[in-house]
Amino acid sequence: MTDVSVKAQADPIAKPRSDVFLLILIGALYFSQGIPMGMAMEAFPVIMRQNGVPLELLAFVPLAGLPWILKIFWAPMVDNCWSAKLGRRRSWLLTMQTLLLIAMVLLAFVPATSANAVLMIVIMSVGMLASATQDTATDGLAAERLRAGALSRANALQIGGMMAGFMVGGGGALLLIDTLGQQYLLLLLSLIPLATIILVLLWKEEPQANHIATQGKARLLDCFRRQGIWPLLLLAFLYGSAHAGGMSITKLFLVDLGWSNQDAGWVATLGGLVLIVLGSPAGSWLASRKLWTGLTIGVFVVMVGLGTWGLLALGSLPVNWITVAIATLWLNIGSGIIAVCAATLNMSFGGSGKQAGTDVTLLQSVNVTGEMLFAGIVVWLASLLGYSTMFLAVACGGLLILVVARLVRSRLSPAALMPLNEDATGA
């Protein structure tokens, strides 16, 4: 197994004074990336259905999300190709934000009817392609230029920003669609990628970053040759189960108990807000000090949350707004901590190599695949074992994440953790 020296990465690291603007830029980019996801996965299926689009056509809407899984196959191109005039990351950020802006403006002028359903799905797919490709460039930017505490803060912005963007593009759009109408709503949301384009234009990428290309072209196969990549891939596959598995089944559990769709929606909104406001900042704070300890704390907090849901399903606790809020609080605080700590680890690994965008994208693609699989597995387990046994079994399964995390720590080279300071990698 080979690992890449981090010496060539020393020059592109952002100076502390420039970290603030860079973090603002990165947060805005992650926020804008979440908006098309919320629109495609949550808002537009509802809007199109209300306008009479048949379910047979709506079944194809989730295909718009495929770029987020498949982006690993063109991630090396994002690392390898850019305009010398614009800069390595700036080239892709400007191009993809412009493409996203065009897609959103086009959607504003295409009525959500059955006749336009296929066209809308195609336009949404273009928007998702832009956001997924931009994500590779944004991750590469953060991994190459940020270190220590700034890196953990960037990952808090990643998790919280994308969740916030998803909520604005999803639930936020549904709240405003009746008041503003489709055209004005989409034009209003289009101001967000327009604002990020302005931020990218204001940021001048240091030309020193361009010398990374002299280390050789980025290749997907090179990811698999790095020391410690296989246990890290396993961790990436598993850690998303905490949030995706928990949140996908809790709403079904409440609906089966007679809660309304609106009530379940409020619980989901509460969970998202908790992850943004409490979970992600807590994860950033822990990751910047004791990353491995933070990951362990996050897993145990999630286990408490899932255990609380299990007690609700058993009838040991009454199911009311207070107990549901407490269970949601634990689950999403823990999920936020895990996500930020794991993402910080992934970016540290990517930033220590020669192809940060490709390496981080591979880990993210595996993570998304794991989330999708676990979201279905927990539903299957609930049908087989019942809600209470399923919740408690998944809670105990959190220990597997800790076992794999210890394996990752033992297999990674010291160079892979150099972007983090010594304290952050402590026990």
Language model feature labels by segment:
Residues 293-342:
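C-terminal transmembrane helical hairpin of 12-TM major facilitator-type secondary transporters
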Residues 11-65, 230-235, 239-257:
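Helix-loop boundary and gating motifs at the non-cytosolic
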Residues 132-146, 337-351:
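Intracellular juxtamembrane helix-capping segments at the cytosolic ends
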